[in-house]
Amino acid sequence: MTLRGPAALSRRGFLAGSAGLAAAGLLGGCASPTTASGATRVRIWSWLTGMDKYVAAFNAAQHEVAVELNVIASGLKGGYAQQTNALRAHNAPDILHAEYQGLPQLLTTGGLRDLTADLADLEPGCSPAAWQGVRPGGRTWAVPMDLAPMVLYYRKDLFDRHGIPVPRTWDEFRTAAQAVRAADAAARITTFPLNDGSFFAGMCWQAGDPWWRVDGGAWRVNVDGEGTLRTADYWQRMIADDLVAAVPTGDQGWIGAMHQGRLWGLLGAAWSVGTLGKSVPQDKNRWAVTTMPTWNGQPATGVQGGSAFAVSAESDVPAAAVRFLRWLSTDPAVAKIGTTFTTPFPGYLPSRAVAEKAYKGGYFLGDPVYGVLDEAARRVPDWTWGPNALGLFSTIADHLGGVKTGSTTLTAAVRQTQADAVANLRSRGLTVLEGTG
């Protein structure tokens, strides 16, 4: 599926979005641009698992550039606030960590280097979804590293034992959910975590109605579009009919339910491969993976995560920073290193082939993990993240909290989130339009 970047948004428009962003955290100190050995010093802040291994490998492979890593708190746990603060204070490192949904927030500071000319040759080799993710406003602001398309993981042994077909549509998924509960009254087909705004966004992404897009010089906000409301209504009925659990993915309640065989599936991203292997290692060769069920059989899937890296506009060593980021995104060594501690799904397609070849596998029945993820990545529809996406994740999670108790519904939560998103952008002095236009 071809992806198209949003219409060009003026730099002024993005900068205006900075008003009202929270900024807190420690600032990095200035450092000499060279080391004692004469290598060009490049400073990077990141929370990416394994970044220390990547940095060590790069530094060992050459001696002209010396990368120095400062591990910071993960994005919404302080990383974005720390980086936003540093950019505003003109004291940022050379390289900053940004997931695709977080890049517009960093861009609103005016502190990122435009990498359009530096990286133009990378586009043909990148997954369209990853490339779109680093081009808010139609310019390239970061180097994509990985992508996290969503898929369906399921207990193939239990589905087969009870004769439950693998669902290909959401109607079939509901039928399968009813069959799971009929087979085991304590079991559910999956959980729908009401505490995770990024999960809900990924599920709505599949429906093909972007929550933001650029319309001339304005931001058009469409959180309550038809696709999102259809998604909300579907899952509201699944929750109301007690066909899914509502425990947060990854917490102790979820792990306990998985250990006891009370959850037969997981709607998750590429990184969920590692989550399953670590959480329920005893279930090796019981799980399988397939593409997400679809609406009306039309192939599409959402994305939940993916990392990219930007360069500070005030870096004294931009060429050296870009050199490292090119290596991080495209060098085969990175994919090989990644497979020693995770299941990487690179945004750069040649690196993805290297990761697949190095993948040790063995957990999933049939183990077509990369084949399924590749197919999912090709199904990702157009999407644009707005400058208030990170705050919106928290907002929608707050509204979803009342769904479990029955004090609100998913549909009502979506409509309230739309109102909040519009009010937030207008409070920053931005021109905001609503609906599909």
Residue ranges, per PLM feature:
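Hinge/lid segment of periplasmic solute-binding proteins
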Residues: Y100-M150, M203, A288-T290, G371
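C-terminal lobe and pocket-closing loops
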Residues: S272-D283, W295-T395, V432-G437
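Conserved N-terminal structural module of periplasmic/extracytoplasmic solute-binding proteins
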Residues: T2-Q105, E123, V166, V247, ...
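Extracytoplasmic/periplasmic solute-binding protein
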Residues: R139-M145, M150, R174-V221, G227, ...
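Alpha-to-beta junction loops
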Residues: L87-A98, A186-A187, Q260-G268
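Conserved C-terminal helix/tail region of periplasmic/extracytoplasmic solute-binding proteins
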Residues: D160, E375-G437
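A structural signal for short loop-to-beta-strand junctions that line the ligand-binding cleft
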Residues: P93-D94, L122-L158, R188, Q298-T301, ...
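Glycine-centered hinge/linker elements that transmit conformational signals in sensory
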Residues: A177, A218-P248, M292
